[in-house]
C-alpha cells in the first residue's frame, strides 16, 4: 500500500522535514490540520512504528523510582532550619546575643528570605513553562510519529534534572549568604562589634562617677546591662578593659573625667555638691582620689596588688595637679595647727 503512491509519500516526507525550519505562528493550527488530513499520514505512522520496533527502543521505568538529589535535600533542610524556606520563624542568633543584634540579624535575614523566594519563584515559573512547552510539542509530534506517554514524561524528567542545577546554585548561594550573615554577628574573633553610643555614654558616666572605686557590684552590673541592652559579662569585660586603658593613657583619661564631671555638674543642684562631683570626699582627699582612683589609702581592702601589679605612681603623669594637691594638703594642715 505504501509503494502505490510514491509521489504522495515523498511529498509528505518533505513536509515533515520542513517542520524544523518553520517558526511557531498563528498558521500552525492550519498546517497541523493539513497534516492530519493528508491521505498518507497513517501509512507514514505505520512505517515509523515498524522502524521503532525493529530498533528495540525501550523506555526505562525509573522515573518514579529515582531518589531525590541528596545535595538538594541537605540544602533544603538547612534553609528550613535557618528560617529562609518554609514558614517565617524569625531567625535567632541565640540567647547570648543582645536585643539590638537580634533585631539587626532578623532584618537582614528577612531580606535574604525575600530575595530567595523571589528567585525561586522565577526559577519554578521558567521550569514549568519550558516543560509544558516540551509536553505540547511532543504531544503534537505523537500525531505523526509514535511517542508513548512514558517517553514524554521521561523527557520532561530529564529537562527537570537539568533545571535542578540552577536550583542547586540558587540554594547554595543562599546558604552561603546566611552563613556569612551569622559569622558577622557570632564570630567575635573575625569582627568585633562595638557598643552603641548610648551604651558607651552610660558606662563611661558610671566609671568616671565612681573613680574612687571603679569596681561595680553585681547588682550595679545587672542594672548597667539592662540600661545598655547588653550582657553582664560584657559589662564586666568593658570595665576591665577601661581600667587598663585608664592606666595606660592617664592624660586622655583625665580629660574624659573632666568632661563627665562637667556633665554631672550641670545636673547637680544641691549646694556645694555642684562644684565637686566627688563631694563625698573632703578637700585634698577628693583631689587625691581623682588623681589616683587606685590609691590603697583611699579604698580600704582595695589595691592593685591583687591584680599582680604595684601601686600606681601618678606624679609622673601630671606633676601640676599633684603639686596643687600637695599645696592644698599643706594649707589644710596649717589651718588645723592654727
UniProtKB/Swiss-Prot annotation:
**Tree of life domain:** Eukaryota
Q: Which SUPFAM superfamilies match?
A: Homeodomain-like
Record feature DNA-binding region, as residue ranges: 188-250
Q: Which processes are annotated in GO (biological process)?
A: animal organ morphogenesis; anterior/posterior pattern specification; dopaminergic neuron differentiation; embryonic organ development; mesoderm development; mesodermal cell fate specification; muscle cell differentiation; neuron development
What are the UniProt keywords, alphabetically? DNA-binding, Homeobox, Nucleus, Transcription, Transcription regulation
Where is this chain's protein located in or outside the cell? Nucleus
Name a GO molecular-function annotation: cis-regulatory region sequence-specific DNA binding
Tissue-by-tissue expression: Expressed in head dopaminergic neurons.
The ranges of region (PBC-B) come to 94-187
Effect of inactivating the gene: RNAi-mediated knockdown results in egg laying defects, abnormal migration of QR neuroblast lineage cells and vulval protrusions due to ectopic induction and defective morphogenesis of vulval precursors cells. RNAi-mediated knockdown results in the absence of the transcription factor, mls-2, in the M lineage.
Which residue range or ranges hold the PBC domain? 4-187
* Cellular component annotations (GO), alphabetically ordered: nucleus; RNA polymerase II transcription regulator complex
Q: Where is this region: PBC-A?
A: 11-91
Q: Does the entry feature the keyword Nucleus, yes or no?
A: yes
Indicate the family of this protein: Belongs to the TALE/PBX homeobox family.
The UniProt entry, under PANTHER family, shows: HOMEOBOX PROTEIN TRANSCRIPTION FACTORS
The record's subunit annotation is:
Interacts with Meis protein psa-3. Interacts with homeobox protein nob-1.
Q: What does this protein do?
A: Transcription factor that binds to the 5'-TGATNNAT(G/T)(G/A)-3' PBC/Hox lineage enhancer region of sem-2 to promote cell fate specification in the postembryonic mesoderm (also known as the M lineage). Required for the M lineage-specific expression of the transcription factor, mls-2. Required for asymmetric division of the T hypodermal cell, probably acting via the regulation of asymmetric expression of Meis protein psa-3 in concert with homeobox protein nob-1 and the Wnt-MAPK pathway.
**Name of the protein:** Homeobox protein ceh-20
Q: Which gene encodes it?
A: ceh-20
Amino acid at each position: 500500500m505504501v509503494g502505490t503512491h510514491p509521489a504522495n509519500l515523498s511529498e509528505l516526507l518533505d513536509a515533515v522535514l520542513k517542520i524544523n525550519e518553520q517558526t511557531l505562528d498563528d498558521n500552525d493550527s492550519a498546517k497541523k490540520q493539513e497534516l492530519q488530513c493528508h491521505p498518507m499520514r497513517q501509512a507514514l505512522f505505520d512505517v515509523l512504528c515498524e522502524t521503532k520496533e525493529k530498533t528495540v527502543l525501550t523506555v526505562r521505568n525509573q522515573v518514579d523510582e529515582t531518589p531525590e538529589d541528596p545535595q538538594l535535600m541537605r540544602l533544603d533542610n538547612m534553609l528550613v532550619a535557618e528560617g529562609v524556606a518554609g514558614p517565617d520563624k524569625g531567625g535567632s542568633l541565640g540567647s547570648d546575643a543582645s536585643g539590638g543584634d537580634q533585631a539587626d540579624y532578623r532584618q537582614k535575614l528577612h531580606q535574604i528570605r525575600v530575595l530567595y523566594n523571589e528567585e525561586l519563584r522565577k526559577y519554578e515559573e521558567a521550569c514549568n513553562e519550558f516543560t509544558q512547552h516540551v509536553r505540547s510539542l511532543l504531544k503534537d509530534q505523537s500525531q505523526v510519529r509514535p511517542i508513548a506517554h512514558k517517553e514524554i514524561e521521561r523527557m520532561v524528567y530529564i529537562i527537570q534534572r537539568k533545571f535542578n542545577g540552577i536550583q542547586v546554585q540558587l540554594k547554595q548561594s543562599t546558604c552561603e549568604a546566611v552563613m556569612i550573615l551569622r559569622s558577622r554577628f557570632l564570630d567575635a574573633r573575625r569582627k568585633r562589634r562595638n557598643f552603641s553610643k548610648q551604651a558607651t555614654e552610660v558606662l563611661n558616666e558610671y566609671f568616671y562617677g565612681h573613680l574612687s572605686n571603679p569596681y561595680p557590684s553585681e547588682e550595679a552590673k545587672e542594672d548597667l546591662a539592662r540600661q545598655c541592652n547588653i550582657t553582664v559579662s560584657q559589662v564586666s569585660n568593658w570595665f576591665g578593659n577601661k581600667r587598663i586603658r585608664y592606666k595606660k593613657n592617664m592624660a586622655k583619661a583625665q580629660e574624659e573625667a573632666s568632661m563627665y564631671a562637667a556633665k554631672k555638674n550641670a545636673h547637680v543642684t544641691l549646694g556645694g555638691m555642684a562644684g565637686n562631683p566627688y563631694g563625698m570626699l573632703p578637700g585634698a582627699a577628693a583631689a587625691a582620689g581623682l588623681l589616683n582612683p587606685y590609691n590603697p589609702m583611699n579604698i580600704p581592702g582595695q589595691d592593685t596588688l591583687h591584680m599582680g601589679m604595684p601601686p600606681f605612681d601618678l606624679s609622673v603623669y601630671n606633676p601640676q595637679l599633684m603639686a596643687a594637691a600637695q599645696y592644698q594638703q599643706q594649707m589644710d594642715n596649717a589651718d588645723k595647727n592654727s
